[in-house]
Amino acid sequence: MLGSSVLRLFSESTDNAVTGSVQSKNSIRLLPEKIRNFVIAGIDVKEADLLTKLLDQVQPDIVINCVGLVKQLSDVNDPLVALPINSLFPHRLAQMCASVNARLIHISTDCVFTGKKGMYSEDDVTDAQDLYGVSKRLGEVDYPNAITLRTSIIGHELEGHRSLISWFLNQKGAVKGFKQAIFSGLPTIEIARIIRDYVIPNPDLTGVYHVSSEPINKYDLLCLVADIYQKDIKIIEDHQYKIDRSLDSTKFRNATGFKP
């Protein structure tokens, strides 16, 4: 979901020589036709030799890692599947990037926090109890050539209906909207723009940074989405479910000048 948005945005400019990678050739057919030629298929990130060969071939200045098992997949509960992808791979990739003098931009998640407090800063202790949150925390990179962006995203999947937007637009009749569930994420295309306009121009940024918008509850968010997409559906206020994983991105805003 994020990878296709990043590829689409960066390929719009002739100033960028862009290369994307996917594991399956079938994934390419899901991409907009105009960006398919930028993509190399058959890259399994668990195969170190393939990645090394790809990096040697492309010689990138910047690598944006959009690979990860998402919370909605059942495999994320299997440590033998989740840990190699979410935890180990980012660190291996950072080392590979260093070998070709490339900077790694890695994407993490607000799910490293339980959501009991809200407005988490980078100084707050990560307290996720589930394997997904723990695996993503272990995968956060902090090297001289790497930056980790903690955020939350919404957007359209290339296929399936697991993401919030895709799920909501596929519903009929009525859905619940959680008034006590707080979200501070951003659309995938906006994350891509932030990387282009604020992260890449600041090569000295390393370590973990929170990237967020102003917090909104999930009920209001769904109402906003329904209005934008002219979705005729009843959204029922639910006050029972309570979680607040909103992120305080003051550090990132001060360092880059970003304003949501």
Predicted regions: what they are:
Residues 129, 141-190, 197:
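NAD(P)-dependent short-chain dehydrogenase/reductase
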Residues 21, 66-67, 104-110, 114, ...:
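SDR active-site strand-loop-helix element
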Residues 80, 84, 88-92, 111-149, ...:
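Catalytic helix-loop patch of NAD(P)-dependent Rossmann-fold dehydrogenases
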Residues 194-249:
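Mid/C-terminal beta-alpha module of Rossmann-like enzyme folds, strongest
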Residues 20-29, 44-45, 68:
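N-terminal Rossmann-fold cofactor-binding loop
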Residues 100-102:
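A short helix->loop->beta-strand "cap" motif at the edges of active sites that frequently abuts
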Residues 42-85:
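NAD(P)H-binding glycine-rich loop region in Rossmannoid oxidoreductase-like domains
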Residues 3-4:
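N-terminal Rossmann-fold NAD(P) dinucleotide-binding loop
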